Amino acid sequence: MARKDSEDQKKFMSRMFRGKEIFKPLNTGWIDEHVACVREWVANIFFYTKNGKTIMVDAGYNYERLGEKMGWLDIDPSSIRHILITHQDTDHVGALEQDSELLFRDATIYLSEEENRYLTGEIRRKVIYGLYKLPMVKIDNRRVLLTDGQIIDIDGIKIECILVPGHTWGHMVYLIDDQYLFTGDTIWFGADGGYSFISTLAESNKLSVKSLAVLEENLKRRNESIKIITGHTGWTDNLEFAFRHRAELCAPFKKRMHDPNAPYDGYEESEDTEQSARGARLAKQIDYAAK
């Protein structure tokens, strides 16, 4: 999807979701000493740093302020050599597209074998219950294709690759160093817990719900404290909260529990500043149902 398409999507989505409390991105900053994020309108991209090495999780929109905001975190785009891709939607791979600023032209990207079929043109991405095909994404970066359950090591960082299809056919989540789960667009956090991600954007809602059940059981067996980090609605370390409504869909226009921290318009970025990025840590999602 070209930069113009990204801008058009921004205008359309801003009008459609204004006041609906659907998108609640983190502002640019640090979750803890290992994980940082950049806010791009309603989306977050993430950086994981360990022993002086940094990898990136997703590549956001085709967004002209990415380099600037990475500077707020003291991360040089040229230092990024490895990017984990949860899925190929334009708000997760835009900075890799052919007409982007190509900040990461030399980086290797990692994605599932199934998800790569979108990039080769074997299948097309469909939304709105299969009624609308999205423009094909074009990326030239070197690719490493992953399989479900595969464990890889990048610069001493352990990455477990877990297939969670539904939003897209090859959506993958990444468990890093057994402590941080980057979930992309599989889980949507509401004020009262996690739901299966936005219904109108899924390839198969039925498969999404089934996949989340499998993921929850996978995590429960580990008996470990894990930070669950989403692409659009923040993070939590409460497993029960994250999966509380996993069998239900986030229906964009359905009335739900009010979240006083949700922005009226997620595409308005005036509160995302360098001062805040260099300030306090980014707080986890509040469970308003427990109040």
What is the meaning of each model-derived region?
Residues 3-9, 261-291:
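C-terminal regulatory/interaction regions
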Residues 36, 84, 110, 144-146, ...:
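Hydrophobic/aromatic beta-strand patches that form the interior of the parallel beta-sheet core
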Residues 55-58, 79, 83-84, 161-163:
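Short catalytic-loop micro-motif centered on adjacent basic/acidic residues
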Residues 21-72, 173-184, 188-190:
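Conserved beta-strand hairpin/beta-sheet module of binuclear metal-dependent hydrolase folds
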Residues 63-65, 71-150, 247-256, 260-267:
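Active-site HxH/HxHxD metal-binding segment of metal-dependent hydrolases
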Residues 11-19, 23-26, 30-32, 61, 113-165, 169-241, 245, ...:
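Metallo-beta-lactamase
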